[in-house]
């Protein structure tokens, strides 16, 4: 897996950050998956550059005044990809593991997320301060056994259908 991540990083570095809206969103998702939230945020900020509706350019991305992704013609991939990248920076789920703040940018040292859905329709609500998780609330409509990773800690939990798991950290 490390070899694949290293190869992905090298490919992203060589290709650079320029591209259309959907392409920048995709690259932001990949940088977040690699754990580099600062680079992912740079791409998202580039995607939020306002562009003129009458301008037709195949490079540079940006958004139209109505907040739709600029890529002649408009493609929803950029908007959905932008949201996916933000979530990928805040929480990742893989093989029954939920990782909180895996790629948190330095600029987002305090915050919260509510209503994030993980596979199995598990609802995640969490807060952080100074880049450390301070509260976790999980709710599942089904029985679930999973591992949560936060603040360098790993914890195995069991969720019973309809019940909540809550943790407050100091």
Predicted feature residues:
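Beta-rich accessory regions
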Residues: 1-23, 32-40, 113-170
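Active-site core of glycosidic bond-cleaving carbohydrate-active enzymes
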Residues: 1-93, 134
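Short alpha-helical interface elements
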Residues: 52-56, 111, 151
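Catalytic cores of secreted or luminal carbohydrate-active enzymes
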Residues: 73-124
């Amino acid at each position: 897996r490390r070899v694949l991540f290293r190869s992905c990083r090298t490919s992203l570095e060589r290709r650079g950050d320029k591209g259309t809206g959907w392409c920048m969103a995709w690259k932001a998702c990949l940088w977040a998956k690699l754990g580099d939230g600062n680079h992912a945020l740079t791409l998202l900020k580039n995607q939020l550059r306002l562009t003129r509706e009458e301008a037709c350019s195949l490079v540079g991305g940006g958004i139209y005044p109505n907040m739709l992704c600029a890529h002649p013609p408009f493609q929803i991939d950029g908007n959905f990809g932008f949201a996916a990248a933000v979530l990928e920076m805040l929480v990742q789920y893989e093989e029954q593991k939920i990782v909180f703040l895996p790629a948190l940018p330095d600029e987002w040292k305090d915050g919260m997320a509510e209503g994030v859905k993980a596979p199995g329709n598990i609802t995640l609500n969490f807060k952080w301060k100074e880049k450390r998780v301070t509260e976790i609330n999980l709710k599942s409509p089904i029985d679930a056994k999973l591992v949560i990773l936060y603040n360098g800690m790993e914890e195995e939990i069991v969720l019973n259908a309809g019940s909540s798991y809550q943790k407050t950290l100091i």
